[in-house]
Structure formats: structure tokens, C-alpha cells
Curated annotation (Swiss-Prot):
Protein name, entry field: Adenine phosphoribosyltransferase
Cellular component GO terms held in the UniProt record: cytoplasm
Disulfide feature: none
Pathway: Purine metabolism; AMP biosynthesis via salvage pathway; AMP from adenine: step 1/1
Record field: catalytic activity: AMP + diphosphate = 5-phospho-alpha-D-ribose 1-diphosphate + adenine
Assembly and binders: Homodimer.
């Protein structure tokens, strides 16, 4: 199905002052309840990545899982879950990163990636880039290389996509919004 930017953007809701005052939250959940919109989004990524040399798709907890799982299925690639600390069973490898007030930690299962793996890293949204940069550090520490970061939404005013590009990581998003 051909991608229609206007249609997909019409599904994304803006919730003002959530999760805190002054933030315009971009809610992608209506895409998941709209089969046409979901198909457009998935097909846009399938067409972009079907003829590439990616070997794995990694995705960030939790909304990144929803599109990435379908994309991994469509492209027949292994899916790597990048989760918050304590959410994965078995042996894990972790990476700490700074938050606005404190620190958080991401994990992948030991052996999820190895040297030579070419990874597409997927998340629902690019904001400040902190979580994505931590996920990149985690995956590359195991020898994988990041081919591209993909997201449904980019908030370029928050600087995350530029930080990724400054780190020589290509970035692709379907929609961009100004402001927070």
C-alpha cells in the first residue's frame, strides 16, 4: 500500500501537557487500531529495508516493539528486544544512560547480537536521543553495527536525530513535528 503522509499524520493524536506541563505528547496508538494506517506504516518500512543487508532488527521498549515485530516478520529477520533493566529473563548485558533526573538502564539478552551483525534499530519516536544512543552503545559493545535508526516520529527540535547523525548513524522517520 502506498504511504500517505497526510493520512498517517491524521491518526497521530497530540495530547497537550502530558506527561507533564508544556509537553505536546505525540500519541501513535491510534495507528494500531486503524488497519489501513498500520499497513501503510509497515509497508513504508518494508519497502525501505527489503533490499538492504540488515541481519537483525532491534527495538526499544515498549511502543517500538509493535511495529518492529511486524517488520521483522515481514522481512524474516531476528528481532532483538532492548528493554528496561529487569524485564528480560536469563543472562543479560546492560547499558546505563542519563535521564533528566537520574539514570536508567537498558538490557539485551546475552548472545542476541554478535560481531558482523548489521542492525536496524527501531523506536516509535526520536526525541533527545538518549535512549537510542544507549541502545546503540549496548548493541555495538557486542560487535554489531547499526545500519540505521528508524522511527515513526522525529521531534528534531529536541536534537536527538542530530545527535545520531553527529555519531554517523543514519536516521529515517516517517513524520516530523516541530516543538516538544
Amino acid at each position: 500500500m502506498l504511504y500517505d503522509d497526510f493520512y498517517v499524520k491524521s491518526l497521530i493524536q497530540t495530547i497537550e501537557d502530558w506527561p507533564k506541563q508544556g509537553i505536546s505528547f505525540r500519541d501513535i496508538t491510534p495507528i494500531f487500531s486503524d488497519p489501513k494506517g498500520m499497513r501503510m506504516v509497515v509497508d513504508a518500512y518494508v519497502h525501505r529495508y527489503i533490499a538492504t543487508d540488515i541481519t537483525h532488527i532491534a527495538c526499544i521498549d515498549a511502543r517500538g516493539f509493535l511495529i518492529a515485530a511486524v517488520l521483522a516478520y515481514e522481512l524474516q529477520k531476528p528481532l532483538i528486544l532492548v528493554r528496561k533493566k529487569g524485564k528480560l529473563p536469563g543472562k543479560t548485558i546492560s547499558q546505563k544512560y542519563a535521564l533528566e533526573y537520574g539514570e536508567a538502564e537498558l538490557e539485551i539478552q546475552e548472545g542476541a547480537v554478535k560481531a558482523g551483525d548489521e542492525v536496524l534499530l527501531f523506536d516509535d519516536l526520536i526525541a533527545t536521543g538518549g535512549t537510542l544512543l544507549a541502545a546503540i552503545e549496548l548493541l555495538t559493545s557486542q560487535g554489531a553495527s547499526i545500519k540505521e535508526v528508524a522511527a515513526i516520529i522525529d521531534l528534531p527540535d529536541l536534537g536527538g536525530s542530530q545527535k545520531l547523525r553527529d555519531s554517523d548513524i543514519p536516521v529515517f522517520s516517517l513524520c516530523a513535528y516541530d516543538g516538544e
